[in-house]
Swiss-Prot record:
GO terms for molecular function: small ribosomal subunit rRNA binding; structural constituent of ribosome. Keywords: Ribonucleoprotein, Ribosomal protein, RNA-binding, rRNA-binding. Binds directly to 16S ribosomal RNA. It comes from Bacteroides fragilis (strain ATCC 25285 / DSM 2151 / CCUG 4856 / JCM 11019 / LMG 10263 / NCTC 9343 / Onslow / VPI 2553 / EN-2). This is Small ribosomal subunit protein bS20. The keyword rRNA-binding applies. Disulfide bonds: none annotated. Pfam families: Ribosomal_S20p (PF01649). Gene3D superfamilies: Ribosomal protein S20. InterPro entries: Ribosomal_bS20, Ribosomal_bS20_sf.
Amino acid sequence: MANHKSSIKRIRQEETRRLRNRYYGKTMRNAVRKLRSTTDKAEATAMYPGIVKMVDKLAKTNVIHKNKANNLKSKLAIYINKLA
């Protein structure tokens, strides 16, 4: 256990951030899963901007890497374009 007040506070903050990052990461993964399970092009096209916004925010806050975000957006766009 940490001895300094600032160290104890830092531990508290890190735990809060870790839980928040896990929540947002899981929410993003579920949204991507939902889009990938969709077979309707109109529905997928409507969902795509919201998912892109979510992915970009997570990349900006370093929850996910920026290259992963770009790869994910690209793969989802390809998936939507392949839908008939």
